[in-house]
């Protein structure tokens, strides 16, 4: 077992602790393999009634090891990229199909690949310190780890909004949105974790509290009006009719990789008609294209490595993107 994942049995549960705090518990291939192996073993241990996963430090999991993926892209190592995403998406499916209760305790940053090892589980507990986001369009990827399945199934057009804009949700907001199932105050989280080990997942009902009001509630009508559109062009047009809020969201979208916003819209839109395995297959296929696109290397440089946050996208505007090329990538 890798030092970055601690796996052990505690009472009636198998515990998984993501233990790479200096990297905000970002998932590398070794961690993905360790998580998968533990889940597969514990599936067949009768004494283990549930699995609990949490993160060490201030993050649950900040996503995949995007630096390593960029390095592979720069080196032209498509086999390493394929292996990483293939194994990550296989883990997402293992979690989604897991026969035993799977409980994610989210008490910090949960983004991208972190949502992938959280949202597919049966129970997702969020505290007031939790922060959920799918920020992939900002680095010229797309909402993956099964997001093309779960985003279209969130209320109204909220999923498309979250997937394209990368908007961050606090813990209570994640419950309202459907990404989390229970809100538990941070002060009670360790007691809940201990109770699950002795009394099982029934403890969730005892510790969960009513979520504070949804901070996006006032924006939901506009989100639904705009992001329910059948094309990205129509979303952009509708946003021009929404005053200051629409201007803000337009500016957000136009700051993202133009190509990424287009292919992200396309694959999330298609995900509404696919089951999870089909979504994961389509996502893996799309990674082969987007990691060869110059925007991916540039986006990770600007947002993750150099952190100047001034990416030079190519092309630089949504209207300049070859829509036919994007459509071919999505086939």
Where are these regions (language model features)?
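Hydrophobic/aromatic residues within transmembrane alpha-helices
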Residues: 16, 53, 65, 117-118, ...
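Loop-centered beta-sheet repeat module
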Residues: 152-198
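Glycine-rich beta-to-alpha active-site loop
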Residues: 95-139, 161-162, 166-171
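Gly/Pro- and small hydrophobic-enriched strand-loop and loop-to-helix capping segments
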Residues: 121-144, 178-192
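Amphipathic alpha-helical blocks and their helix-capping loop/short-beta junctions
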Residues: 179-256
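Glycine- (often His-adjacent) and acidic-residue-rich active-site loop
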Residues: 55-90, 140, 317
């Amino acid at each position: 077992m890798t030092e970055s994942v601690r796996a052990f049995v505690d009472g009636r549960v198998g515990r998984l602790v993501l233990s790479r705090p200096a990297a905000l518990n970002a998932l590398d291939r070794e961690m993905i393999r360790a998580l998968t192996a533990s889940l597969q073993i514990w599936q067949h241990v009768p004494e283990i009634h549930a699995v609990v996963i949490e993160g060490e430090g201030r993050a649950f999991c900040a996503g995949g090891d995007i630096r390593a993926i960029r390095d592979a892209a720069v080196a032209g190592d498509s086999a390493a990229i394929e292996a990483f995403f293939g194994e990550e998406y296989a883990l997402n499916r293992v979690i989604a199909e897991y026969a035993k209760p799977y409980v994610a305790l989210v008490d910090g940053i949960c983004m991208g690949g972190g949502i992938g090892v959280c949202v597919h589980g049966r129970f997702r507990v969020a505290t007031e310190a939790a922060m959920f986001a799918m920020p992939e369009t900002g680095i010229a990827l797309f909402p993956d780890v099964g997001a093309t399945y779960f985003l279209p199934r969130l209320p109204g057009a909220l999923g498309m909004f979250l997937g394209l804009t990368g908007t961050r949700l606090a813990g209570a907001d994640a419950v309202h949105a459907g990404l989390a199932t229970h809100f538990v105050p941070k002060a009670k989280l360790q007691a809940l974790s201990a109770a699950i080990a002795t009394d099982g997942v029934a403890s969730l009902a005892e510790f969960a509290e009513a979520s504070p009001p949804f901070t996006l509630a006032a924006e939901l009508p506009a989100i639904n009006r705009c992001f329910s559109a059948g094309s990205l062009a129509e979303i952009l047009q509708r946003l021009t009719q929404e005053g200051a809020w629409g201007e803000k969201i337009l500016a957000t979208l136009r700051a993202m990789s133009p190509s990424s916003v287009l292919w992200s819209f396309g694959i999330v839109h298609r995900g509404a008609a696919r089951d999870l395995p089909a979504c994961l297959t389509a996502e893996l296929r799309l990674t082969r294209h987007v990691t060869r696109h110059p925007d991916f290397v540039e986006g990770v440089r600007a947002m993750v490595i150099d952190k100047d946050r001034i990416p030079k996208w190519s092309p630089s505007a949504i209207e300049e993107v070859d829509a036919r090329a994007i459509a071919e990538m999505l086939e």
